[in-house]
Amino acid sequence: AMDTWLASVSQIEVPAGAFAVTNPANTKEVIGFHHHSNSAQMEQTVTNAEAAFPTWSATAVTERALLLNKLADQLELHRDELLALCIKEAGKTVGDSMAEVREAVDFCRYYAAEASKNLQAAQARGVVLCISPWNFPLAIFLGQVSAALVAGNTVVAKPAEQTSLIAVRTLELMKAAGFPDHVVQLVIAPGRQVGEVIVPDTRIQAVMFTGSTETGAWIARKLAERGGEPVPLIAETGGQNCMIVDSTALPEQVVDDVISSGFQSAGQRCSALRVLFLQEDVADKIIT
């Protein structure tokens, strides 16, 4: 995927077979291109990850944790570039983009620290499929990938096709941090195609997924159809998040918090506010 990534903010012709990535705030602005993986390429990514597993899983957990900390250093070094990508490709605000990069750094350092303390005798599973969403294209992508890697697994990472350039750049930074070839394999393609080809592959030993409840249930069914030993699935899907407001709350602050929680990322967040409970004493002030 890295070989076919072309970063550009100019209006140039789309390369043959590539898909243009546009700024969601200005769809006439092309910020880059990517190619979708076909079935044969998807199968090859699993093969590459499987081949890299014996050496990577035998690497000392302290060394794997050290590489995560080096990746965190790379993220901080390239913070401004990653901010720009989050804004241009994912349509995030500056504030949200800053929080996104910080969260990605925190994930790397957190899993590095926890692994060093708790995974000395743990046994890795094998190849893990990580499927991440567009609304947190750096933080959730790296949260999944870093957790799987530091435990000694190799990874096939499937970012949302809408925000794949961020994932490609992250892989470049992983390479700069010293991660070996093939321990992380990137697949860029529509989710259904990836699900049909990779999820049923018996070489996949675990799946991490963040997205819709419907898709999470579909993945669970596909894994169950494989039979044999159950395949671990970590699925983070939608939720019904509520806010309870009593008479001690400042109405103007409540309104501001409700709007930001419910409508940032167009409401497309697992943590977005869905239900508001108001004490009668303050209900009229807040609603009107």
Question: In which residue ranges do the predicted regions lie?
Answer:
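Hydrophobic packing residues within well-ordered alpha-helices of enzyme cores
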Residues: 108, 167-170, 198, 219, ...
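Structural signal for hydrophobic
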Residues: 128, 152, 184, 204-207, ...
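Short beta->alpha connector loops at strand-helix junctions that form conserved
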Residues: 158-160, 188, 246
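Terminal low-complexity tails and localization/encapsulation signals of metabolic enzymes
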Residues: 1-47, 51, 58-74, 84, ...
